[in-house]
Structure formats: structure tokens, C-alpha cells
């Protein structure tokens, strides 16, 4: 590969085909952190003195995000910077989540970061395994169902942790996959909600995505080079539904045309910005919401997705929900 195109001193380790850079391992790590720092600055994601909740699952993306944000907070100029809190959700996937949660706890202990953990069982009265026990004959994907509950769980953890902003580890691949899926589903309204920095007028916590401009492959390499122990096994439910097909298609496109994901990302941001300005959201990235008729949480419709999904689960599962959960849904 030759010498590093950045420092010119060490042998190159990784080539970014979309930019032509051939980087040594240290320069790759440094430029990845710099890219995240620029993204945070570009979208005004974080402010000094804020309490930042980092959604940490135990996978490569979330652990890398936690380490990068911790690094950006470190050093002699760290006074007045963000205070980090890890927000971890236990979905209840037997044989999978225990390892990831252990990795999350390990990095939090190493970095001295507070951790707040919530579970589906405590919040909704059932685990993800229980919720999906009935789903074999239905068209709804596991990821769609889990996503609804996971977003609510992170919100609940954020409130308990009293944070000002939640940082999630969605990378560039996640972003363009979601953009493509919304296009394929004809969901124009959701396209207006894809801003890397969003807020709801009825919810006090902002949501930001600092890894938005980093390829998934590069996040994985950063985690490897940083010697971050993370769960490499995929969720047993992740290969269901449209997202898996979209992921494979975009990866094939990128392999043939390096940089295509960056082009799609720029297009997605342009569409999101235009829809926001055209009034499909309240201001820059703010969603228009109403209180859910059942739980009172902010919702884009009369009844929120969590309440609708919970009712579906209770109607089809083979277990009896706890009395407390039934009372909360009424």
C-alpha cells in the first residue's frame, strides 16, 4: 500500500476508496475522531456543560461512540464540556443481549462513565423474545417492532438519567438505509425527520447522531484498532424484513462505485432540509406531535406506536401480561 498519505511516516493500513486516502492505523483513528468532531460542530449537536446520554447497546457502533465522545471530553480543555451518561436497553433476547450488556458495562467502568439501564420487561411487561413469539405468520418485521419499543425505552432511560440530549450511534450506512426504506415505503413524513440533530417540542431531550458521516465499516475498524471489546454476533432477528435487502444492495453499489453512500447521504440531507422548510416539521428538525390518547406521550398520531404495538403483542402472545402492565395500558 505504501506510506500513509497523511503522516508519510508509517505504512498505510487502510484505504478509503471514496477519497483515495491510504492511512496508517493511528492516522485512521485520528481522522475518524476528527470527522465525528466536525459532524458535532456542523449540526450543533452538543453544547458545553450539557449532560449527554449516550445510547450504548454493547455493539461496535455504540461503544465506539462512547469512547470517541469521552476522548473529545478529555484533556486540559475539558472544563465545562459535556457530562456523559450511558443509556443501555435490555430488550430481552436470550443468548444474545447478556454478552452485549456486559461489554457495555465493562467500557463504562473503564472510562468512569455512569450507566443507566432499563429493560423491555420492566417498561412494557414483556421481553422482545416474548413479544415476537407469535410473529411467524405476520408480515411485520422484528426490527420494526423492536425499533418502536427501543426508541421509547431510550426516552425513558433519558428521563431517568436527567440528560439534556441523547446521542445515538447511527452511522452513515444506517442513515442511508433508513432513507431508502422510507422512499420504498412512500413514507414522506418520516423523510422530514431524518435530520442528524432533532428535537420534539413536547419532549425536553434532543436527539443527535454524531456518527452520521462515518461508514459502518470504518466504525468497526475504529473499534478494532482501539481494542474495544464488543459483541460481533448479529442480533438473531436482524436478517428479517426489507432493511437486510436494502443493506446488501447498498453495499454492492458501494463496492462497484466507491463513494455512492456519501452521494446518497448528501441527497438524503437535501431532501430532509427541503421538507423541513416546506413545513412538514416544526422548524429545523422538530416534529409536530400530539399527546397519545392512551399514555399521553408525544405522538405523530392519536395513539402512539408503542401503545398500538403493545396491544398487538398482548392480543397474540402466549403469555399473560402482568396486571401492572394491563393497568398502565388502560
Give the location of each predicted region.
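ATP-dependent adenylation/nucleotidyltransferase module used to activate substrates
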Residues: 3-181, 185-192, 197, 201, ...
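ATP/NTP-dependent adenylation/nucleotidyl-transfer catalytic domains that generate, transfer
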Residues: 1-30, 35-54, 82-83, 190-330
Amino acid at each position: 500500500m505504501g506510506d500513509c498519505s497523511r503522516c508519510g511516516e508509517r505504512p498505510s493500513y487502510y484505504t478509503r476508496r471514496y477519497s483515495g486516502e491510504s492511512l496508517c492505523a493511528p492516522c485512521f483513528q485520528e481522522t475518524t475522531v476528527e470527522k465525528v468532531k466536525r459532524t458535532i460542530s456542523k449540526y450543533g449537536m452538543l453544547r458545553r456543560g450539557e449532560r449527554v446520554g449516550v445510547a450504548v447497546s454493547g455493539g461496535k457502533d455504540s461503544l465506539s461512540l462512547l469512547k470517541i465522545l469521552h476522548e473529545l471530553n478529555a484533556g486540559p480543555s475539558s472544563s465545562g464540556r459535556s457530562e456523559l451518561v450511558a443509556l443501555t436497553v435490555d430488550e430481552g433476547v436470550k443468548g444474545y443481549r447478556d454478552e452485549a450488556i456486559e461489554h457495555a458495562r465493562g467500557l463504562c467502568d473503564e472510562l468512569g462513565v455512569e450507566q443507566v439501564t432499563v429493560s423491555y420487561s420492566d417498561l412494557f411487561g414483556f421481553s422482545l423474545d416474548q413479544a415476537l413469539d407469535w410473529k411467524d405468520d405476520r408480515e411485520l418485521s422484528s426490527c420494526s417492532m423492536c425499533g418502536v419499543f427501543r426508541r421509547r425505552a431510550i426516552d425513558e432511560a433519558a428521563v431517568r438519567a436527567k440528560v439534556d440530549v441523547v446521542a445515538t450511534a447511527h452511522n452513515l450506512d444506517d442513515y442511508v438505509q433508513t432513507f431508502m426504506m422510507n422512499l420504498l415505503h412512500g413514507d414522506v413524513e418520516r423523510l422530514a425527520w431524518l435530520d442528524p440533530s432533532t428535537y420534539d417540542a413536547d419532549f425536553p431531550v434532543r436527539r443527535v447522531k454524531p456518527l452520521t458521516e462515518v461508514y459502518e465499516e470504518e466504525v468497526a475498524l475504529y473499534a478494532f484498532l482501539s481494542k474495544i471489546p464488543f459483541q460481533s454476533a448479529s442480533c438473531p432477528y436482524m436478517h428479517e424484513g426489507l432493511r437486510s435487502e436494502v443493506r446488501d444492495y447498498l453495499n454492492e453499489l458501494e463496492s462497484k462505485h466507491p463513494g455512492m453512500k456519501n452521494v446518497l447521504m448528501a441527497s438524503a440531507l437535501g431532501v430532509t432540509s427541503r421538507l423541513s422548510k416546506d413545513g412538514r416539521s416544526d422548524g429545523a428538525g422538530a416534529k409536530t406531535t400530539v399527546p397519545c390518547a392512551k399514555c399521553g406521550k408525544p405522538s405523530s398520531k392519536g395513539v402512539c406506536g408503542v401503545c398500538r404495538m403493545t396491544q398487538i403483542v398482548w392480543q397474540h402472545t402466549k403469555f399473560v401480561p402482568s396486571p401492572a402492565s394491563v393497568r398502565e395500558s388502560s
